[in-house]
Amino acid sequence: MAAVRGVRVVGSSPGLLLGRGMRAFLLLLWLAARGSALYFHIGETEKKCFIEEIPDETMVIGNYRTQLYDKQREEYQPATPGLGMFVEVKDPEDKVILARQYGSEGRFTFTSHTPGEHQICLHSNSTKFSLFAGGMLRVHLDIQVGEHANDYAEIAAKDKLSELQLRVRQLVEQVEQIQKEQNYQRWREERFRQTSESTNQRVLWWSILQTLILVAIGVWQMRHLKSFFEAKKLV
């Protein structure tokens, strides 16, 4: 979803890997790109799904609005209120964590509990699609992840925070989000390491099995040839 999918940060080895300061800087750049806005078109029975990599315990907010194509004006116009949008979100274990019907314009929110790839799917309620007779529906979607999902103007008004207090709170939440992203990167590296070790082990056992098969075939051929020569009284 995001314009920048992420910065891969690995462990520390002198001369080969980035220092802590540079890694933190790259993570800040990555966090800055966590908000992603786009638009897409869907047909009457079509479902659009997007994959977003999200750390655990991270809030995600999605805002969307729909438009119908006006053939007379030859342009997209805001959709009628009767045209709804169904939003479904699944976690990396394929469990549904959000499934709800919204209006033609709305906002959905969820919090991740498992790190990894989350699937966000949207499709319209087909019973209302007769309103535009098989045309295309344009959906504008804006997704904010983590600290970017917070409305700090609302937080400042609600908690009566000064500008300095609000800034400190923003910095604290940014640091917390960076820690979550670092933990997520370590989790991904651990999974990759486990997958690599499992693959290497399978390759090793397959090589051993191939060797045993070749040895067994060689022994069988030797015994078969010996029996053949004995039957022909050549030995």
From Swiss-Prot:
GO terms for biological process: COPI coating of Golgi vesicle; Golgi organization; positive regulation of organelle organization; protein transport. Appears to be involved in vesicular protein trafficking, mainly in the early secretory pathway. In COPI vesicle-mediated retrograde transport involved in the coatomer recruitment to membranes of the early secretory pathway. Increases coatomer-dependent activity of ARFGAP2. Thought to play a crucial role in the specific retention of p24 complexes in cis-Golgi membranes; specifically contributes to the coupled localization of TMED2 and TMED10 in the cis-Golgi network. Residues 38-202 are lumenal. This is Transmembrane emp24 domain-containing protein 9. Residues 223-235 are cytoplasmic. N-linked glycosylated containing high mannose. It is a single-pass type I membrane protein. Monomer and homodimer in endoplasmic reticulum. Predominantly monomeric and to lesser extent homodimeric in endoplasmic reticulum-Golgi intermediate compartment and cis-Golgi network. Probably oligomerizes with other members of the EMP24/GP25L family such as TMED2, TMED7 and TMED10. Interacts with TMED5. Interacts (via C-terminus) with COPG1; the interaction involves dimeric TMED9. Interacts with PTPN2 and SPAST. Interacts with STX17; the interaction is direct. Residues 154-184 form a coiled coil. Residues 1-37 form the signal peptide. PANTHER family: TRANSMEMBRANE EMP24 DOMAIN-CONTAINING PROTEIN. Residues 47-145 form the GOLD domain. Glycans are attached at residue 125. Keywords: Acetylation, Coiled coil, Endoplasmic reticulum, Glycoprotein, Golgi apparatus, Membrane, Protein transport, Signal, Transmembrane, Transmembrane helix, Transport. Its main location: endoplasmic reticulum. The keyword ATP-binding does not apply. The modification N6-acetyllysine is found at residue 160. The gene is Tmed9. Belongs to the EMP24/GP25L family. The chain crosses the membrane at residues 203-222. It is found in: Endoplasmic reticulum membrane; Golgi apparatus, cis-Golgi network membrane; Endoplasmic reticulum-Golgi intermediate compartment membrane; Golgi apparatus, trans-Golgi network membrane. A motif (COPI vesicle coat-binding) lies at residues 228-235. PROSITE patterns: GOLD. It holds the Pfam family EMP24_GP25L. A motif (COPII vesicle coat-binding) lies at residues 228-229. GO terms for cellular component: endoplasmic reticulum membrane; endoplasmic reticulum-Golgi intermediate compartment membrane; Golgi membrane; synaptic vesicle.
